[in-house]
Amino acid sequence: MTLLTFRDVAIEFSLEEWKCLDLAQQNLYRDVMLENYRNLFSVGLTVCKPGLITCLEQRKEPWNVKRQEAADGHPEMGFHHATQACLELLGSSDLPASASQSAGITGVNHRAQPGLNVSVDKFTALCSPGVLQTVKWFLEFRCIFSLAMSSHFTQDLLPEQGIQDAFPKRILRGYGNCGLDNLYLRKDWESLDECKLQKDYNGLNQCSSTTHSKIFQYNKYVKIFDNFSNLHRRNISNTGEKPFKCQECGKSFQMLSFLTEHQKIHTGKKFQKCGECGKTFIQCSHFTEPENIDTGEKPYKCQECNNVIKTCSVLTKNRIYAGGEHYRCEEFGKVFNQCSHLTEHEHGTEEKPCKYEECSSVFISCSSLSNQQMILAGEKLSKCETWYKGFNHSPNPSKHQRNEIGGKPFKCEECDSIFKWFSDLTKHKRIHTGEKPYKCDECGKAYTQSSHLSEHRRIHTGEKPYQCEECGKVFRTCSSLSNHKRTHSEEKPYTCEECGNIFKQLSDLTKHKKTHTGEKPYKCDECGKNFTQSSNLIVHKRIHTGEKPYKCEECGRVFMWFSDITKHKKTHTGEKPYKCDECGKNFTQSSNLIVHKRIHTGEKPYKCEKCGKAFTQFSHLTVHESIHT
């Protein structure tokens, strides 16, 4: 009895085929192959881990595995054998025998092997229909690619022509002889000829809605699995489902690729190594940035300010900070950094000039009207299961859902608050549940959001990534830097409604308001004294505990107050920044300068209530009062 093996459900690509897949399609391929392997492993149909799976887990290019296996002398276990077996177990009738032979798929009879049905049933029971359909899409792509690159298609291929240019022209010349009439590629490409889009598939918006549909039919065999993956990911995002769970820590993820990346944290594996400094990294993106650091290379240049930047993400942020506002609303003149922001703004105007007579729906743009025409014509090539609306090309159910119910589709059942994004609703729910899933490993403090934990960790690491360009001072959080910048600009945006005083910080205004209300909500449990601010209570408690947290690194002396250690440090440095304008004498502390100035002014603010004698310093008054007692 021949049991089903991983080879029977695996798909392997050559280097040329792999290059035709974009990043999203390559990630989908990894997800599907890894899931197939796990399903086989769970029913005991495989024991040893194949080299392809190891390669995919390490995010290496899988075509290397195929080339290595061919070199090892196992041609009978190559791609063509696996492809035909995979088609049989999936029950595929989409590709006729002539097409399989043209693609070089040989070595297995068209009937299933004896004994294969039992193991196939176990395997397919674990696979979702979407995964099985995706495998078939990959096989169709592989078959058509082989046809396009066969000898009678490429014999007159010009040297300067690449695979992408040759694909549509060469496949139409002889695909009818290969039994592929059911794919309707000839009619689809004739529509593409009308738009002259043989080399530029990004100009789809210039074509009619009918041509859009035909272009999609062509793309069905080159990028059809991209639509499946995008729709599947959007549905998961909308429902909040996280089906992939880490067995080590219990954390769940929406995508299998996210789980794979996360598992590297537990294993400690770092597959990418920098040749300059020797550091290893888990992800390729992490690897690329340190290489730029070591070499000093800054390959990204901002066209706005001519700054050269090491990473593309920093370039994007630089453009935002540089005030690059490239998208302007023609109606109101408002400008935006991103096109999506302009689109949302235009939706807010509520003007919908385009109307479709079939259903009386109105649309903001004519492109939206064209999409509606295609939907009513029955050309629904992708479907959002949540909202039951069709999307004909590049579907975006998320935006559709937000527009469908007024822009904020996610509602809290506890307090009826509504949110535009599901992630915002998830964060909000933690207010009601009290959940704090993000915990600091150092001190055990927990937070509701990961960003808050990241900021907290900087307390332990001492990291201060935000620097003021004016004075060079560094800060732990971006908000602290924003508050600090007001000291340079003298901006005071916060005004007290009671007395009209203005403040630079909101926290300062909050503290000030308590002077009007007389509120002192913070009480000392030891002596019952009340304070307006929690920080004042914390400092006060040191009197009872005797805590002295501030230590001088020079002499080892400890102090209760931060201001005391600041003053003390000046005794080591000899710094005397406070100078008397009258006599030129310098002092380490401003309070000493104030007392000294009374010598010149003759001011004596401290008066004895017994005899009326006055003194320049409070300490002198205290000594004098002991005479009366």
Curated annotation (Swiss-Prot):
Residues 76-243 are annotated as: Spacer. Its main location: nucleus. Disulfide bonds: none annotated. One of its GO terms (biological process) is regulation of DNA-templated transcription. There is a cross-link at K383, K492 (Glycyl lysine isopeptide (Lys-Gly) (interchain with G-Cter in SUMO2)). One of its GO terms (cellular component) is nucleus. The keyword Oxidoreductase does not apply. Keywords: Acetylation, DNA-binding, Isopeptide bond, Metal-binding, Nucleus, Repeat, Transcription, Transcription regulation, Ubl conjugation, Zinc, Zinc-finger. It is found in: Nucleus. InterPro entries: KRAB (IPR001909), KRAB_dom_sf (IPR036051), Znf_C2H2_sf (IPR036236), Znf_C2H2_type (IPR013087). Residues 4-75 form the KRAB domain. Expressed in adult heart, brain, placenta, skeletal muscle and pancreas, and in fetal lung, kidney and brain. There is little expression in adult lung, liver and kidney. A zinc finger (C2H2-type) spans 244-266, 272-294, 410-432, 438-460, 466-488, 494-516, 522-544, 550-572, 578-600, 606-628. GO terms for molecular function: DNA-binding transcription factor activity, RNA polymerase II-specific; RNA polymerase II cis-regulatory region sequence-specific DNA binding; zinc ion binding. It comes from the Eukaryota. The modification N6-acetyllysine is found at K408. Belongs to the krueppel C2H2-type zinc-finger protein family. May be involved in transcriptional regulation. This is Zinc finger protein 195. It comes from Homo sapiens (Human).
